[in-house]
């Protein structure tokens, strides 16, 4: 629409403004249009590969206000990083303000795709309004909600570069799209039942289920105990009724996921509060537009109601609906109530929602792929015809009982990717390919690092192919050819081999970064720190500079340099990698180190391999040494009888953490009266406290700065109460690590300590050690924007490569 013609004014000024950041797909052009109209400005706004370009003409005062409000009043999903400005010649006949077609210049891309967001309250109100033309339409969205990253092929962000391109808008949708006063003004995924994507339900044989409402029939099947594959934003879920133990057991059997915990989806906070402890931080996370899976401390009775969902664990993964389709499932189960009132009330439907990634392969995204890979698992398929362009799992986080800044990522993916992490310096573009487990990749542009969504474990060809796809997608949307390629030291990782191939193909240097150096560097990178730091890297395994298996390290990290200052006592791994899956083997290794190898067979009578393991240890055959902290957790679990073998990675440590938490709730008779340390009164996310006492004289630090926890395991070997032993293990470990770190700080004079590695996913360890060291006056940096585990090391590899790059 044209503005009324204004009189020409010799004091009229025209400027060109370039806005950089997350400014495409978030309603930024409509926002600029409305703002310019309000201020009486003439000109135009358009997307280009670098962000948003604006030419505006009017009074100097109006232009000053425009610049100020571009930042101050930007749409909620936008992020304005930079505003550039230059003067232009005023146009004599300038009149009106318009949104122009997007431009593709030869300039480098400087914008980013927005992240996928949960359906907004305005769209929900329409979704449940029988008088609205989008009533119960599973693809409702607007400029403030809906898919972005997972349906975008390239920039600039226009319908033609998304998977909505095959769906031309009908006249009513076009009218909304072109109406400046409408919240769907230039909403690229805009659609309705007449012109947009649609649903279909298929049976187990892949044949359409005719003459049914797909939503109603899906809910009926779920309530009958069936398993339904449901197509979402970044891939398929496998869903079943969490209350139905038989359905959960069938899902475990068919997916071959024996004990690994499932997440559940509930309708709202009121329902979530029935099953988990929710503080202000958890509530904010559950209802955030990113809609991650949030780990909640289970309430009493959860395991009885949800048998087999998260067996033996203290935490339950919970998420709220984030797509209209998911909301419609709960709406149907509630009897199709009008309005939004029902969303404030507890609802009975609770769904297991697990990623459809059979065999540990990548998440299923396509309809044909689902029919091939999920046949025999799903009893039905709820599909739609909007293509998923970017595979993206649900994110998993844990709150800290406080508001949103205190968040620990366990998996960073949907909702947070591809949000950039600001670096403290610019440099050449670096591509880092991460490690072999929980893989992510990272690509830099100037002072921004773009970490991909979770790729997975590179133990199969399909996941390796997914890594290649992730690299290609980041390069395509950022239009960058890296000048350096970074990778892990391990020569047998696919990520390492592929990094070498890419470096050779592009004729650029390849930079090898030691695994634990990368863990610490990742945290330094996200905190923007260039200063030397003491790194405490605790995880399962990573190849060390000496070719040995590391995993319990004290490091001095100074830019691109890293020096090993100390490590945990090395334990043998009888049977090699098998010891990492069978905690009884690590317990046997500990017994042998105590000089009690003769007890191994009697201690583990159910393990037919016990005699052989005893011989391995005695003869030092197939028992490589490792300083891994993870293996000390396994040894403790094995000695306490918590777990002799594991069904999934980290299970023993997670069960041990749960036992320790449970001991904190019980009366304390029998606890030792003489203690070296106490972790009493530490707040928990659910509002209770965790209390445990450290054992005295339960560790040693030798002249070479090796921390020996064998005395702790000796004490645990005689413990008859597993929960008490687990609590003592955690409390003593925190005390030992505190003493070890403080002694190293005193020697080096470096007073910044950085935590890195998967062991810091342990809530008790991470929170209490952080508090202890902070009380000593030390600065403690922890992972906040990425997981502390291998999901973050690609960023660390990037940071080290940048530090080593010539200025």
Curated annotation (Swiss-Prot):
Q: What Enzyme Commission number(s) appear in the record?
A: 6.2.-.-
Region named Disordered = 663-682
UniProt catalytic activity:
C-terminal L-cysteinyl-[HypE protein] + carbamoyl phosphate + ATP + H2O = C-terminal S-carboxamide-L-cysteinyl-[HypE protein] + AMP + phosphate + diphosphate + H(+)
Q: Which InterPro entries match?
A: Acylphosphatase-like_dom, Acylphosphatase-like_dom_sf, Acylphosphatase_CS, Carbamoyltrans_HypF-like, Carbamoyltransferase_HypF, DHBP_synth_RibB-like_a/b_dom, HypF_C, HypF_C_2
Which part of the chain is the Acylphosphatase-like domain? Answer: 14-101
Q: What Gene Ontology terms for biological process does this UniProt record contain?
A: protein maturation
Residue ranges annotated as transmembrane are none
Record-linked SUPFAM superfamilies: Acylphosphatase/BLUF domain-like, YrdC/RibB
Question: What pathway annotation does it carry?
Answer: Protein modification; [NiFe] hydrogenase maturation
An MF annotation (GO) of this entry:
carboxyl- or carbamoyltransferase activity
User: Cross-referenced Pfam families, in alphabetical order?
Assistant: Acylphosphatase (PF00708), HypF_C (PF17788), HypF_C_2 (PF22521), Sua5_yciO_yrdC (PF01300), zf-HYPF (PF07503)
Its EC top class is ligase
Decide whether keyword Ligase is in the record. yes
Query: What is the superkingdom listed in this entry's lineage?
Result: Bacteria
Recite the UniProt keywords alphabetically: Ligase, Metal-binding, Plasmid, Zinc, Zinc-finger
Q: Where are the zinc fingers (C4-type)?
A: 120-145, 170-195
Outline the extent of the YrdC-like domain: 212-415
Tell me the NCBIfam families matching this sequence.
Answer: hypF
**PANTHER family xrefs:** CARBAMOYLTRANSFERASE, CARBAMOYLTRANSFERASE HYPF
Give the family this protein belongs to, as stated in its UniProt record: Belongs to the carbamoyltransferase HypF family.
Write out the function statement from the record.
Answer: Involved in the maturation of [NiFe] hydrogenases. Along with HypE, it catalyzes the synthesis of the CN ligands of the active site iron of [NiFe]-hydrogenases. HypF functions as a carbamoyl transferase using carbamoylphosphate as a substrate and transferring the carboxamido moiety in an ATP-dependent reaction to the thiolate of the C-terminal cysteine of HypE yielding a protein-S-carboxamide.
Q: What is this protein called?
A: Carbamoyltransferase HypF2
Q: Which organism is it from?
A: Cupriavidus necator (strain ATCC 17699 / DSM 428 / KCTC 22496 / NCIMB 10442 / H16 / Stanier 337)
